[in-house]
Amino acid sequence: MTFAANFSLVLPEVILGVSALVLLVWGAFQRKTSPLFTGAAVLALLGAAVAAVVGPHGHAFNGVYAADAAATYAKVAIYLSSAVAIVLGDRWLAVRGDQKFEYAVLVILAAVGMGVTASAGDLISLYIGVELQSLALYVLAAFRRDDAKSSEAGLKYFVLGALSSGLLLYGASLIYGFAGSTRFADIAAVGAAAAHGTHGVGLLFGLVFLICGLAFKVSAAPFHMWTPDVYEGAPTSVVGFFAAAPKLAAMMMFARVLGDAFPDSVAQWRQVLIIASLASVFVGAFAGLAQTNLKRLWAYSSIANVGYALLGVATGGETGLHSMLLFMTLYMVDVTGFFACLQALSRDGKPMETIEDMAGLVKERPGIAVAMTAFSLSALGMPPFSGFWAKFYVFGAAMGSGDVLLQWAAVLGLVGSVVAAFYYLRLIKAMWFDAPAGAVDKPQPTARAVGFAAALFSFPVVMVALIWLDPAARAAAAAFGHA
């Protein structure tokens, strides 16, 4: 393949990489962000999304990079989520009077890394993408350098992230040692030929370490320890970003590695994913019961929801991966909207971040209270909100798989949803029935608008959106397994 053909396939990453460098130089002279600077960053992400949609499909650089329907689907969602994060972050910085230009640059660099992982066709490109996004996210977690909790969050994330990278690299080195290649297609060929020999066992041993490293990135139990502390300490706009785009990118990593590199080892890795899925669901459900801080509560909610997405990956095949992609897309909208609403709220200039702070919110800010209620019911899986359809697809895929383990996992997942209902309903009860805790400041218009838009998507827009989201996710799921 010629250089021009390779270049056309990686154009979205090129656009974002060049834009990040230009914005970095621009910011160095300007010293702070501005509406024009923020607009340029958002435009770069939208341009990359368009390039991903209209660009050609194929494999670049001898199979190291895959531009297919799955990558396109994930990149569009990731880039749009990143653009929203930049807009919300710009408003957060403006309120604090500390308009650092690095915020937008870091989000773009994280988006580049996520895009690379979504298109990875090789263990090396996978690792490069993972580390590029992780390094940017470490800095974003500690972006409030004058805040002890933010600095602590960034440090914890960095230290545990280094551990997970070590696990991932160790697994990758074992796989390379037994397969003799880092390309997913070559690993799949070796795995198929040596499924019952020493090489097959060695590959599976490496895969276990690789899954452990990836589980950290997606906050799956038992590698979830960093999530509540990082969510609590990081800025609200950053938390909304953390809970959305990186989660989809991490799920794409799971789908790429398992679907493209280990398609003949489904029986082995399915058991591991089912255990991780159920552990995540029940850790998220039960640990969330004791939380009063909303960021920590939604951290455990995200752990539980990762469990449901992993159930879709464990189901495998086009149906399972289709359910995972739809689940993550709908979940991204809900979690972005919830944290946008949370960012919009303050009392006496201080953020409202606990359930007690939300007491009587419907009397002070009825619109935001209704939106947050919608997001809570959606995360719970209550019909007709988008979260119901997300879980409907995942549980439907598991129950229709014909695998008894997956069917029991789906039943237990429903039990976990019932347990988690308590903390969602506790928040709703505080907003609607408790006495107001005091006057609420005028909300941030941009954050409020994002929250309202996401709430409208959750219902009723989702009913129309699924008409084109469903076939798009199905086409994306069909692309896996063709490394």
From Swiss-Prot:
GO cellular component: plasma membrane
NCBIfam families assigned: NDH_I_N, PRK05777.1-3
Entry protein name: NADH-quinone oxidoreductase subunit N
Family: Belongs to the complex I subunit 2 family.
One MF term in the entry's GO annotations: quinone binding
Subunit description: NDH-1 is composed of 14 different subunits. Subunits NuoA, H, J, K, L, M, N constitute the membrane sector of the complex.
One GO BP annotation of this record: ATP synthesis coupled electron transport
Localization of this protein: Cell inner membrane
Keywords, alphabetical: Cell inner membrane, Cell membrane, Membrane, NAD, Quinone, Translocase, Transmembrane, Transmembrane helix, Transport, Ubiquinone
EC number: 7.1.1.-
HAMAP family attached to this UniProt entry: NDH1_NuoN_1
Function description: NDH-1 shuttles electrons from NADH, via FMN and iron-sulfur (Fe-S) centers, to quinones in the respiratory chain. The immediate electron acceptor for the enzyme in this species is believed to be ubiquinone. Couples the redox reaction to proton translocation (for every two electrons transferred, four hydrogen ions are translocated across the cytoplasmic membrane), and thus conserves the redox energy in a proton gradient.
The reaction(s) this protein catalyses: a quinone + NADH + 5 H(+)(in) = a quinol + NAD(+) + 4 H(+)(out)
Name of one Pfam family that matches: Proton_antipo_M
Source organism per UniProt: Caulobacter sp. (strain K31)
Bilayer topology term: Multi-pass membrane protein
